[in-house]
């Protein structure tokens, strides 16, 4: 069985949060930079290119920008990076 990832998702992306939970991932809502710690990757809206400093090296994994992507496309990005 595949180990599911811990994904940080910006709080305005509720559709992405729900889709990732349905896939079995652990989803953490990103309200501050500390929320990103321990996440395998983070999904942000991209409206603020450095949302809460998460684009910095505060996480070990990828930062996925959801701007212009569908929920399915974001989920595919998560799958390919975790």
Swiss-Prot record:
Can you list the disulfide-bonded cysteine pairs? none
Would you say which domain of life the source belongs to?
Bacteria
InterPro entries, from UniProt?
UPF0180
A Pfam family per the record: UPF0180
Q: Which family does it belong to?
A: Belongs to the UPF0180 family.
**HAMAP family referenced in this protein's UniProt entry, alphabetically:** UPF0180
- Could you identify this protein by its name? UPF0180 protein BT9727_1277
Q: Which organism is it from?
A: Bacillus thuringiensis subsp. konkukian (strain 97-27)
């Amino acid at each position: 069985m595949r180990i599911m990832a811990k994904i940080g998702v910006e709080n305005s992306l509720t559709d992405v949060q729900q889709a990732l939970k349905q896939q079995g991932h652990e989803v953490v809502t990103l309200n501050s930079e500390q929320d990103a710690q321990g996440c395998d990757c983070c999904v942000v809206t991209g409206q603020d290119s450095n949302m809460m400093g998460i684009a910095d090296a505060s996480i070990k994994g990828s930062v996925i920008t959801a701007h212009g992507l569908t929920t399915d496309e974001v989920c595919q990005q998560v799958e390919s990076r975790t």
